[in-house]
Structures are given as structure tokens and as C-alpha cells.
């Protein structure tokens, strides 16, 4: 699994002109799922993201996690995070998991996050979405279950 995690003041996602998910202070997570992902990757990514110390403490240092600040979470599926641009000019997405298998992994990730976070909002899996993000900082972190970065 691969995620782009952005600290936000607010974020929302729309489908067909309707807001389907919206949060205030928290994290916007763009989540990509690989054909190689396993069940333990879901727990690893959830724990890593929810406990990333990317919120400021009283001294202005990045010492607090989403859980510490009781922030909100917006999770959006993003298969293009597995786009491979090494050959040619058109990305290849053969490493991205698709269809119902990907939807199942995405939903399991959401369910695990809901066990810890009071407000979890989501995009619509497989839909064409308009995502509005008001970055805070900006603070943007990439997380990968294969630990390649």
C-alpha cells in the first residue's frame, strides 16, 4: 500500500457536484493499493498514518499525531499512486490492484481507521472525484508498506 498523507485545515471530496466527504483539522490520505499487498499491510499503514507525529505541540515542534490532536481523517482511493513512468510517457498501472479486491482492501482500511478516529470521511471508490485540500504547513508525507521511502 502507498499513501500520500497531507496535514490539512480542511478538505472535501465531491462526486457529481455533491460533497460526499468533508473534514476540518486532520489528515487527507490518498491511498493506493498494490497487487502485492497483504492483510498485514492494512494494519501497518493504519498504525503508521494515525501515529505520524506531524502536528505541532505547544512549542511548535512536530510531536503530535492525529490521535493526539483528535483530528479528522479523509481517505480517498488513488490507484494512480502505483503509476510506473519509467518507460515511455504513459504511466503503467499494472501494479495497482483493481476491482472488487481493491474495494475490499480499501474498505478494510477505512474500518480499521474508524476504530481509532472519531470522524472518518471517504471518497467514493472508483468514482471521478473533485478533491479540495487546504494544506496546513504544508506538511505532506509519503508512506509505503514496502518501506521504500
UniProtKB/Swiss-Prot annotation:
UniProt KW Cytoplasm keyword: yes
InterPro entries: Daa-tRNA_deacyls_DTD (IPR003732), DTD-like_sf (IPR023509)
EC number of the protein: 3.1.1.96
Motif (Gly-cisPro motif, important for rejection of L-amino acids): 137-138
Compartments it resides in: Cytoplasm
SUPFAM superfamilies, alphabetized: DTD-like
An annotated GO BP: D-amino acid catabolic process
Record keywords: Cytoplasm, Hydrolase, RNA-binding, tRNA-binding
Pfam families: Tyr_Deacylase
GO molecular function, a single term: D-tyrosyl-tRNA(Tyr) deacylase activity
Cellular component GO terms held in the UniProt record: cytoplasm
Catalytically driven reaction(s): glycyl-tRNA(Ala) + H2O = tRNA(Ala) + glycine + H(+); a D-aminoacyl-tRNA + H2O = a tRNA + a D-alpha-amino acid + H(+)
Free-text function comment from the UniProt entry: An aminoacyl-tRNA editing enzyme that deacylates mischarged D-aminoacyl-tRNAs. Also deacylates mischarged glycyl-tRNA(Ala), protecting cells against glycine mischarging by AlaRS. Acts via tRNA-based rather than protein-based catalysis; rejects L-amino acids rather than detecting D-amino acids in the active site. By recycling D-aminoacyl-tRNA to D-amino acids and free tRNA molecules, this enzyme counteracts the toxicity associated with the formation of D-aminoacyl-tRNA entities in vivo and helps enforce protein L-homochirality.
Subunit structure, as described in the record: Homodimer.
Domain comment quoted from the record: A Gly-cisPro motif from one monomer fits into the active site of the other monomer to allow specific chiral rejection of L-amino acids.
Family: Belongs to the DTD family.
Classification via HAMAP family: Deacylase_Dtd (MF_00518)
Protein name per Swiss-Prot or TrEMBL: D-aminoacyl-tRNA deacylase
Amino acid at each position: 500500500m502507498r499513501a500520500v498523507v497531507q496535514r490539512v485545515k480542511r478538505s472535501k471530496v465531491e462526486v457529481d457536484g455533491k460533497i460526499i466527504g468533508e473534514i476540518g483539522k486532520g489528515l487527507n490520505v490518498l491511498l493506493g493499493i498494490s497487487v502485492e499487498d497483504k492483510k498485514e499491510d492494512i494494519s501497518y499503514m493504519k498504525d503508521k498514518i494515525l501515529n505520524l507525529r506531524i502536528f505541532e505541540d505547544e512549542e511548535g515542534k512536530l510531536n503530535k499525531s492525529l490521535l493526539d490532536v483528535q483530528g479528522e481523517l479523509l481517505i480517498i482511493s488513488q490507484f494512480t499512486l502505483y503509476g510506473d513512468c519509467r518507460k515511455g510517457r504513459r504511466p503503467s498501472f499494472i501494479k495497482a490492484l483493481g476491482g472488487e479486491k481493491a474495494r475490499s482492501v480499501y474498505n478494510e482500511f477505512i474500518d480499521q481507521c474508524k476504530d481509532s478516529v472519531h470522524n472518518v470521511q471517504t471518497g467514493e471508490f472508483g468514482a471521478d472525484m473533485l478533491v479540495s485540500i487546504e494544506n496546513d504547513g504544508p506538511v505532506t508525507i509519503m508512506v509505503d508498506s514496502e518501506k521504500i521511502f
